[in-house]
């Protein structure tokens, strides 16, 4: 599902990743461990298409990834759950979780609400759909972030310290 060949990234003079090679097949799990500043989150950001490597090749499901995800017409479905839940403060919990579904014009508002409610219940959250993120604890916000990653059938899910501050 994921293959890297000589993947490198530099921030100015600093090499963050140097010639990273790995292959992750469908159904396999990979733990990326290392000290702070070793490039763990950078690897996940590259996989999610948020940044591009300086050198090397990344393939997801056999397709070479040359563009940032937002620049692609039909990008691979990669979900990223960050240490910080990255919720939009002006949106309700339902809007934060369901924004991916709103792109699908075939789904009714009622169905979107039901799907969001089901995903929230999967992570142990109930009756929070109309709340704003700042009305929830940090652990609850983390659960919302997980619910957002569950919202549709994702093909690849990457997590950076997802259980930190999880209640």
Predicted regions and their residues:
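ABC ATPase C-loop
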Residues: 150, 156-157
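The feature captures the beta-strand-to-loop junction immediately N-terminal to the Walker
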Residues: 33-35
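Hydrophobic anchor residue at the start of the ABC signature
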Residues: 146
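Conserved ABC ATPase signature
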Residues: 132-136, 140
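Helix-to-loop junction immediately C-terminal to a conserved catalytic motif
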Residues: 48
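Short coil-to-helix segment of the ABC ATPase nucleotide-binding domain corresponding to the Q-loop/switch region
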Residues: 91-99
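ABC ATPase NBD coupling module
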Residues: 65-79, 103, 109
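Conserved ABC ATPase "signature" region
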Residues: 109-128
């Amino acid at each position: 599902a994921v293959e890297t060949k000589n993947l490198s990234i530099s921030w100015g003079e600093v090499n963050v990743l140097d010639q990273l090679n790995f292959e992750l097949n469908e159904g396999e799990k990979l733990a990326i461990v290392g000290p702070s500043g070793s490039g763990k989150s950078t690897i996940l950001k590259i996989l999610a298409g948020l940044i591009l490597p300086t050198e090397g090749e990344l393939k997801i499901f056999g397709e070479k990834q040359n563009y940032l995800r937002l620049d692609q017409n039909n990008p691979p479905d990669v979900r990223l759950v960050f240490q910080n839940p990255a919720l939009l403060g002006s949106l309700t919990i339902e809007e934060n979780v369901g924004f991916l579904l709103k792109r699908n014009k075939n789904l009714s508002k009622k169905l979107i609400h039901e799907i969001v409610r089901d995903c929230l219940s999967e992570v142990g959250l109930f009756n929070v759909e109309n709340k704003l993120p700042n009305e929830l604890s940090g652990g609850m916000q983390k659960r919302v972030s997980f619910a957002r990653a569950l919202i549709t059938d994702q093909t690849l899910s990457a997590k950076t310290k997802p259980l930190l501050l999880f209640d």
